[in-house]
Structure formats: C-alpha cells, structure tokens
C-alpha cells in the first residue's frame, strides 16, 4: 500500500468496529469489519465494543510485511450507555479485552480465526507484547488448560509454589495434592491451581485470577469447610495487578472460594459481592468472615 492512514471507526448504534486504510489522496484502499471483537455475540449485529485499547504495526509472520495487532475493550453488559474509556479492563469493572491479528498478504489483510480463538480463549490478549509472544515467538498458555498430568505442566515451564504445595484428604475425591503455581509469558505471570492425584494426573483445575491480568503475590491457600456441609472447600487469597487507565500498574487483593460437591468443585459468585477484601486482610481472617457469611459463629 505504501504510506496510508489507519482509521479505526465505531458504529455507535451497533457498537461494531471497522478499520479503514486511506491513501494520501484520501481514497480508501482497504476496509474491513471482519474482526474478533465483532464476533463476541454470535449471530447478533449488535456487539459489546467499548473502545480500541491498543494497536501495533509489526511483522508477525516474518514475511517482511507489516501486520496489525489489535486489542479492544468490550463490556459484559447488555448494551447500555458506553462505559467511559478511563475505566480499567480489570476484574469487576465490567470490561474485558479482545485481541486480534490481521496479516498483510496480496494487497489485503486477513485473519487466522484459529489463532484469534486461541489467544482469546487462553487469556493471551492482555497486551501487545503478550500477543506477540504467542503469534510471533511461539509461546503459549494453552497447556495450562489442556494438560492432563503434573509432569506435562512442569515440562512446559510451570513453576510450582512450593510453600503452598501440600496434600489434603477431600471427602468426595480422596487424597489429592494441592498444586498452585505460575507460568511466565511476556511481562505477565499467569497463576493456576491444580488438584493432582497420587498417580500424577490432574483431577481438577482452578483459575483464581479471573479477569485480572497478572499475579503480584500469592498470600495463601486454605482447604477448610467454608459453607458448613462437612466437605473441605478451597479458598485462594492473592494480590493481582492490571493496567490502569493511564497505563500504570494497579495492584489489588482478591480471593476466590471453591465449594466441594459430589461431582467436584464450583466457584462462589455471591459471597464476593458481600465480602470485600483489602491489602490488610489475612487468610485466617477471610476464612472467618466467609464462615460467618454462611452462619458459622466466630471460632467455630
């Protein structure tokens, strides 16, 4: 194309993003709205786009041509008023990120739908560097979600947090090892927790980070009965970071609770709306407050 102007444009009625490329004489030489961010609501013209969070032009497939890397901010909402772009794409903000790559070839740009699906499904859409690390450099977090054994995790670079690694007898699942750990990719530390049996097979996995972007520090993991049903539940307490509205790193404390049931575990979504945590909270204090939420007396 030579020298062109890159013009992103939003349809404010349907919240769809379109990209235009204009030559020096202002003629549009290429345009597209075939973007991952326009496919968040399958089969719907209306989409949850809020704003274009980041864009980069670089060669992603080593063919000597500049490709386009995009990150958009989308809302979990139902199509209400646009959220102000000062709102950070973080846990609890109602905003999540969508990454995409457009490869330049034969005078046009095209998307590899499989790559777009992978980078968003496995959380590699946090930053331009994260996407570049996956697309261009070949690193991936996919194994964190697809591994079947602890050995497979370790072989791919998963680092166990040894100070929180221990075994517990779970009433419905037997004796399992609680295996928390991290995987470093680009500038991000991805945090996961696994339950592994004595043969080394993964029985269950947890994603405590949720919509947070990076683990800042693991504060504790507790395996105790929280809801009073006689079954050990799991609480994870950590501090996480995300990119603020001005590009600065913001650190927040967060916790997750997973209740043991006959078929496995399910994550609490209600209690977290009532019990908020701060940097001054402790693991034991959170367990006490969580039990009180379920009607346990302090110290019971």
Give residue ranges: language-model regions.
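Beta-propeller-forming repeat regions
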Residues: 1-60, 65-226, 231-300
